[in-house]
């Protein structure tokens, strides 16, 4: 009986790992198919974010299939065929929801990197608010991966990334207003993730 229980436990573990591989592979292929040729620089950024998410997942024992899949898909709303409102977190989340993507992944995409604040500035906060904010370590980790990866997919500090975003969009742009107003919350999420990675913060 013990041998059978052990065999069943091993089989269950293998099946769970296989499910993770399949889910992440599907997310990666979806992102590649719509971004690699149409938006190659955005694709490099997404690749960098997803690679960092894989490393963070291993370090923090987070739900790998959810975090890494969301990392691959977080900018899919920039794809021309997906654009609806022009606000990529919302457009990406709606698109994924329509395809039947896992709810947690959809919500993480909708809310990634404090998107609700920019949505409120744009006057569409109510549209993003229908997607629940997961909060916690996994949510923070996605923000961390996004904000510490350059547009070309290279590692960068969060403060430098914020400076780069302001320079790219220029003064007076709504994104510049958002990143300025949202910087404290964004940096706090990144700091929490860094503390978790260092073993200083556990939750």
Regions of interest found by a model, annotated:
Residues 23-26, 66:
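Short coil-to-beta-strand
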Residues 12-17, 21-22, 34-62, 73, ...:
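Divalent metal-dependent phosphate-bond-processing catalytic cores, especially two-metal-ion Mg2+/Mn2+ enzymes
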Residues 28-33:
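Short glycine/proline-rich turn/loop motifs
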Residues 2-10:
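Extreme N-terminal basic, low-complexity initiation segments
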Residues 63-92, 96, 106-116:
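His-Asp-centered metal-binding catalytic motifs of divalent-metal-dependent phosphohydrolases/nucleases
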